[in-house]
Amino acid sequence: METIKRTKIVDVLKSDAFGTTVNVKGWVRTRRGSKQVNFIALNDGSTINNVQIVVDVDKLGDEFLKPITTGASISVNGILTQSQGKGQSVEIQATEIEIFGTADPATYPLQKKGHSMEFLREIAHLRPRTNTFGAVFRIRHNMAYAIHKFFHDRGFFYFHTPIITASDCEGAGQMFQVTTKNLYDLKKDENGSIIYEDDFFGKQASLTVSGQLEGELAATALGQIYTFGPTFRAENSNTPRHLAEFWMIEPEVAFNDITDNMELAEEFIKYCVQWALDNCMEDIKFLNDMFDKELIARLEGVLKDSFVRLPYTEGIKILEEAVAKGHKFEFPVYWGVDLASEHERFLVEDHFKRPVILTDYPKEIKAFYMKQNEDGKTVRAMDVLFPKIGEIIGGSEREADYDKLMTRIDELGIPMKDMWWYLDTRRFGTVPHSGFGLGFERLLLFVTGMANIRDVIPFPRTPNNAEF
């Protein structure tokens, strides 16, 4: 086979260099035709669209073509021509074909038919070859690029925080432990507590639940930073919105108050949505047509108006009024409750009909590091609530006063020995600062319109599932 430099299918489909010889490589979506001519739909992952390969059966031979079935991988040399058929502007008249690998139709699971999301999760190693997951993962790439670009263009520094940590940012204790010890022969003291001094790190260590605390340290030196990395929560939650392993984006900015924080969060998420519409429209349109007919309208909708700023207390009043008028929620509504997704979505979808930034939460349901308001009951927290998703961003102005932070840590019984390094930033040149966390997969749920968070990450980690 003549050696010709490969052209990606996304570029072939845009080309008007008719009459030239091109080479494409990819995986066969379908092969159909007659005794005289075959049509191969070929895809290489660079685009949702296939290129049509027109094959003269007499020239290449029927026996040669038989192994070219759905899932087979091939290389094609051919003449680029204008297509006479519907659905494509160009096609390739094949002159040579090389078969890299075959896919037995009797065992290859991705035949030309519909597959359930549950089935595709069982073959997560193959599902990127489907149109749906090709689209999702191209969008995932573009969203990651947009995030880095947003912060880089605004002078933020990308800061790497540790995956293995001895601190629990959220204070929930739901962490995956890291050890090199034999779990069946752990040394314990007279009280039955495990002795960690002779473990690898000399202390109890876990996978991080957040890079925020370390990010705060960086912000008090570099001014404005962001983290973007994997986080881990050992929550036994089998819901369409939870993963045990996911990715978080966490900016932290010195000298920013809660108002600055809200403005940054709104600017950031609108930028990401606009980037998706500008750069991923083919894939978004496919997902809109296949899964969620309101996807594009919903994406465009969040860009139209400013997000509502709503104190938690006012939000509770709105929800209580809805209950009084007959609206039924599964979970109760009262001041002090940590709002459920149904409450958040009611505020966004039914009441305001646009994104809401809920602020000033009761301190009892928020983390120790959040700055308290003068009322002594609430903290300067903020959650960005989105249609279909509920909470998509959570953040706050951080407590910058050493004594107040010490008091709060003591109230919650957090061991001081684990927090000395964090407290040093309040002892030495403390400054007001704020930040937030965006769950990357929740952003992707919104942008793709997918219904389950397991379908926007390549290899989902959930209770009882750690395949691949």
UniProtKB/Swiss-Prot annotation:
Please name the InterPro entries in this protein's record: Aa-tRNA-synt_II (IPR004364), aa-tRNA-synth_II (IPR006195), aa-tRNA-synth_II/BPL/LPL (IPR045864), Asn-tRNA-ligase (IPR004522), Asp/Asn-tRNA-synth_IIb (IPR002312), NA-bd_OB-fold (IPR012340), NA-bd_OB_tRNA (IPR004365)
Keyword annotations for this protein?
Aminoacyl-tRNA synthetase, ATP-binding, Cytoplasm, Ligase, Nucleotide-binding, Protein biosynthesis
Where's it found, cell-wise?
Answer: Cytoplasm
In terms of superkingdom, the source organism counts as: Bacteria
A molecular function GO annotation: ATP binding
| Enzyme Commission numbers on file | 6.1.1.22
Set out the biological process GO terms recorded for this chain's protein. Answer: asparaginyl-tRNA aminoacylation
On whether 4Fe-4S is a keyword of this UniProt record, the answer is no
Question: What is any one of the record's Gene Ontology cellular component terms?
Answer: cytoplasm
Extract the PROSITE patterns matched here: AA_TRNA_LIGASE_II
Give the residue range of the signal peptide: none
Q: Does the keyword Ligase apply?
A: yes
Family (UniProt): Belongs to the class-II aminoacyl-tRNA synthetase family.
Cite the record's note on assembly: Homodimer.
What name is this protein filed under? Asparagine--tRNA ligase
- Origin organism lineage: Bacteria, Pseudomonadati, Bacteroidota, Bacteroidia, Bacteroidales
